[in-house]
Amino acid sequence: MLDLLQWQPPEDLLPTVGFGAPLDARGADWSGRDLAGIDLRGAALCRVDLRGADLSACDLDGADLRLARFDVFTRFPEGFDHRSSGAVGPGAKLNGAFLNSADLRGLDLRSCNLMGAYLSGADLSGSLLDGVRLVGADLRHAVLRGASCVGASFSCCQLDFADFRAADLSSARLEGAESLSGADFSGCLGLDAERSALLSRPYKELDTWNPLTRETTRTSLEA
């Protein structure tokens, strides 16, 4: 029976030796922590921030790492395939993943596989997406404000109402996007080579009003 006096939200759980398995730490911030000695077998680690954390001595058998955040400084156990675990970070294999409305702000997603990913409504503000292949991804209503998308491929993407304001789109491939009705490109860097092609898109796309940014796609490209 749940003891409400002893209960604490999963996101407030601190990694401490001696906790009984399986742990429920969904949404917790464990960034920069040394997790040696923590029993993580079968642990619920969804959305846990593991950036800079040391899990090299942990047993992650059966742990749920979906949407957990890692970076180049995160240390995983030898032989553990963190890139295919559902966690989000550089080199993650997320083709076709359901990431709708996910909070992905400020993450290093370089070398990620995001082909066909469902990212509608996801917040990617300030994230590093340089060279990422987003071919066929659903980015409708996604927020990419200030994101670095240098050399990213958006071919066959749905970009309706995507917010690219102040993003760096240098060498990005946008011409093959399926649709970009209402997308806002205000203040984007590196769009000069693509601007003419984007402005030749159907008028129904270019003249769609974005109620959030209060711009049409056309005016955002012409600014």
Regions found by a protein language model. Name each.
Residues 1-223:
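Tandem repeat scaffolds
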